[in-house]
Amino acid sequence: QEGENFTREVKSIDKSFLKHGDVTVKVDYSCLNYKDALILNNGAKLVKEFPHIPGIDFSGTVLESESDKFKKNDEVILTGWRVGEIYYGGFSQYAKVDGNFLVKRPKNLSSKQSAILIFFPVIFSLFSKANTVSSSL
């Protein structure tokens, strides 16, 4: 970042680059949340530290944990908590986050299904807005 200008790029980083949190997760799926789109469009307004990894929502498997809430191989979901905004997010193979931000994934949902459910409120909102617009025409 230089002033108000910043660049976007995809690059390889070492896991040691991930510095926030006590649980390291192997990310299976992440979705493009509206805040991710804002960050990718004009990150200087929301992101406080560069370089940065967006990805507000993700599902995955715990690799390492210093939290008493999670252990290796626990399947987890994360949504919100300003992850992908002020903390590194899920647009990466790995994420290191505060264990308090995670929830265990329900056993009856696959990682992919849970990622779809994370995205469902966005889809619902879009359809609701589209229906409101069409009914007012």
Annotated model-derived regions:
Residues Q1, K19, P106:
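Residue-level recognition of the GNAT/N-acetyltransferase active site
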Residues Q1-T7:
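Extracellular beta-rich ligand/substrate-recognition surface
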Residues E2, F17, Y29, E64, ...:
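Non-catalytic surface loops within mature trypsin-like serine protease
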Residues R8-V10, K15, S59-T61, Y94-K96, ...:
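Conserved hydrophobic/aromatic beta-strand scaffold that supports enzyme active sites
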Residues I13, F17, G60-V62, L126-K129, ...:
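Compositionally biased regions
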Residues D14-C31, G43-V83:
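Glycine-rich beta-strand-centered segment in the early N-terminal region that forms part
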Residues K35-L40:
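Cytochrome P450 core scaffold surrounding the K-helix E-X-X-R motif
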Residues T79-L137:
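NAD(P)H dinucleotide-binding glycine-rich loop of Rossmann-like/cofactor-binding domains
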